[in-house]
């Protein structure tokens, strides 16, 4: 039996995707009363992680439109001058195709059968939006300050690969050294290139601390020019240029000199913070982060109700005054919603189509003695595309059974060569035979307005490598809507709280 919803709250949040979860936790942490609803029976929405047996739920996310009799019944809950607004159900994930790929006559038993018999299907955790965390980036800072990090675990992305392609050798994957020790041990760079790379790293360190007048002047002259031109002026050769732009500069696609330097400094600042790699990946998949922020919100009093679709919202004098869910009316001062729910009458200001393919394999794209979490920038192989990358995760990240891997290909739909074509070239070169594939298009929709002044539309899914833009957009939305409140302030340690208690008592006595 459905529980009765509260009659009134400060904020109603629709959808449990990562941005909605961040905003819900920020509201609850700031002392606002929050009701968090999701029509799905699971957390994460379009940012979820699914087991292989549950992934069909992605395709079963449609809600039928209200008919005239339902509208008439809901209208009984309205007061004078109020009107019903039906929520949208936009296709954020579309063109979904899932295929089990036969191995041929030599296969004794289909892989699907093997996994089912061994009860391994539920051990996969398949991300709709795979991302990584920068060790000293905005997301890690937010996780630590808010103590959401108490609910999550992470693994170091311990291998970056840089691809090169020639007609003779095809695509070759070269390991990328990140730390100074790895640079000097690397066989991928010559002695001269190692020295030039160390010189560039030193320059970045000096530039970020404003220690080199000559460097600042050189950068100012090339600030809006391509990063490659700036590197050339610094005497960096073509091979090392490609290495820097495609690995150290992975945080920024098609960089100018300024954005390339900022990305390089971010990269190197994160190296050594948790280990030799600057990147982290959440155990059990990226969908875990949504649940972690929801837990924080619940700790501070947010009410949760999954499987409770909102039928309509109520508008009066240009503002949303209530939501109606399963016949219950909940009055509210603000509403936060996923882009999926923005009414169909409101046009999107922009839409970016993101190509996503997930492969399941039983062999890594580059075998090693120990299993690696791998990041591979494909920008050099798809120069016309804004985003092209592979992320390979497996048992070490708790996203696949032992001996199995998930390869996530992500790319924007630009240029003549698709990210799928490049991924399959890499598989062929390294004799990797995927046994399962899921492909889909993710629509990143942005809205300038949702048709009412007290509605906050959460940031959409995006093609960015890490979470900085999501966190920053959530921060800006929160601070614009509630300028008098702090966005997920740093939690006080128990010692600080205990020290403050006696002081409070003394003030009270005086």
Curated annotation (Swiss-Prot):
Entry's transmembrane regions: none
Binding partners and assembly: May interact with rab-5, rab-7 and rab-11. Does not interact with rab-3, rab-27 and rab-10.
Gene3D superfamilies the record matches: FAD/NAD(P)-binding domain (3.50.50.60), Guanine Nucleotide Dissociation Inhibitor, domain 1 (1.10.405.10), Guanine Nucleotide Dissociation Inhibitor, domain 2 (3.30.519.10)
Protein role: Substrate-binding subunit of the Rab geranylgeranyltransferase (GGTase) complex. Binds unprenylated Rab proteins and presents the substrate peptide to the catalytic component B and remains bound to it after the geranylgeranyl transfer reaction. The component A is thought to be regenerated by transferring its prenylated Rab back to the donor membrane. Plays a role in neurotransmitter release from presynaptic terminals at neuromuscular junctions. Positively regulates the function of rab-27 in synaptic transmission most likely through mediating rab-27 prenylation.
Disruption phenotype: RNAi-mediated knockdown results in mild defecation defects. RNAi-mediated knockdown increases the levels of unprenylated rab-27. RNAi-mediated knockdown disrupts the localization of rab-5 and rab-7.
Family: Belongs to the Rab GDI family.
Origin organism lineage: Eukaryota, Metazoa, Ecdysozoa, Nematoda, Chromadorea
GO molecular function terms noted in the UniProt entry: GTPase activator activity; Rab GDP-dissociation inhibitor activity
GO terms, biological process: intracellular protein transport; small GTPase-mediated signal transduction; vesicle-mediated transport
Subcellular location: Cytoplasm
Chief place where the protein resides: cytoplasm
Key words, A-Z: Cytoplasm, GTPase activation
Organism: Caenorhabditis elegans
Tissue: Expressed in several neurons including head neurons, motor neurons located in the ventral nerve cord, HSN and CAN neurons, and tail neurons, and in muscles such as body-wall, pharyngeal, intestinal and anal sphincter. Also expressed in seam cells, the hypodermis and the intestine.
SUPFAM superfamilies: FAD/NAD(P)-binding domain
GO cellular component, one term: Rab-protein geranylgeranyltransferase complex
Protein name: Rab proteins geranylgeranyltransferase component A 1
InterPro entries: FAD/NAD-bd_sf (IPR036188), GDP_dissociation_inhibitor (IPR018203), Rab_escort (IPR001738), RabGDI (IPR000806)
């Amino acid at each position: 039996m459905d529980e009765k919803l509260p009659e009134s709250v400060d904020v109603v949040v629709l959808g449990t995707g990562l941005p909605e979860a961040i905003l819900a936790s920020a509201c609850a942490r700031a002392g606002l009363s929050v009701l968090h609803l999701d029509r799905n029976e699971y957390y994460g929405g379009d940012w979820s992680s699914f087991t292989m047996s549950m992934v069909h739920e992605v395709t079963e996310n449609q809600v039928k439109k209200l008919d005239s009799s339902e509208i008439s019944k809901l209208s009984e809950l309205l007061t004078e001058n109020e009107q019903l607004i039906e929520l949208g159900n936009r296709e954020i994930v579309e063109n979904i195709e899932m295929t089990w790929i036969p191995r041929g006559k030599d296969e004794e038993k289909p892989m699907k059968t093997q996994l089912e018999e061994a009860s391994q299907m539920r051990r996969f955790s398949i991300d709709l939006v795979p991302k990584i965390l920068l060790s000293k980036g905005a997301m890690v800072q937010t996780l630590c300050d808010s103590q959401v990090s108490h609910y999550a675990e992470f693994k170091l992305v311990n291998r970056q690969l840089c691809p090169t392609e020639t007609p003779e050798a095809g695509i070759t994957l070269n390991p990328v050294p990140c730390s100074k020790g790895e640079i000097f041990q690397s066989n991928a760079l010559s002695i001269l290139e190692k020295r030039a790379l160390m010189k560039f790293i030193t320059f970045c360190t000096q530039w970020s601390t404003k220690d080199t007048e000559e460097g600042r002047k050189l950068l100012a002259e090339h600030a809006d020019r391509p990063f490659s031109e700036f590197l050339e002026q610094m005497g960096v050769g073509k091979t090392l240029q490609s290495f820097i732009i495609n690995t150290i500069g992975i945080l920024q696609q098609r960089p100018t000199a300024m954005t390339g330097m900022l990305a390089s400094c971010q990269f190197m600042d994160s190296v050594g913070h948790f280990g030799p790699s600057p990147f982290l990946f959440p155990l059990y998949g990226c969908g875990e982060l949504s649940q972690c922020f929801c837990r924080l919100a619940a700790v501070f009093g947010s009410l949760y109700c999954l499987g409770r679709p909102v039928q309509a919202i109520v508008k009066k004098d240009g503002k949303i005054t209530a939501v109606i869910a399963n016949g219950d009316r909940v009055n509210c001062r603000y509403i936060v919603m996923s882009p999926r729910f923005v009414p169909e009458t409101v046009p999107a200001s922009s839409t970016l189509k993101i190509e996503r393919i997930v492969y399941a394999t039983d062999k890594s794209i580059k075998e090693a003695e120990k299993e690696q979490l791998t990041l591979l920038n494909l920008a050099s192989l798809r120069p016309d595309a804004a985003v092209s990358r592979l992320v390979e995760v497996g048992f070490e990240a708790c996203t696949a059974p032992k001996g199995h891997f998930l390869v996530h290909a992500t790319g924007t739909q630009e240029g003549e060569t698709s990210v799928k074509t490049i991924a399959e070239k890499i598989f062929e070169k390294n004799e990797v035979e995927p046994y399962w594939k899921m492909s889909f298009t993710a629509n990143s929709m942005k809205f300038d307005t949702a048709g009412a002044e007290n509605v906050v539309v959460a940031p959409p899914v995006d093609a960015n490598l890490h979470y900085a833009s999501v966190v920053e957009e959530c921060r800006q939305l929160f601070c614009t809507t509630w300028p008098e409140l702090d966005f997920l302030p740093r939690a006080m340690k128990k010692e600080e709280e205990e020290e403050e208690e006696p002081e409070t008592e003394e003030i009270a006595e005086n």
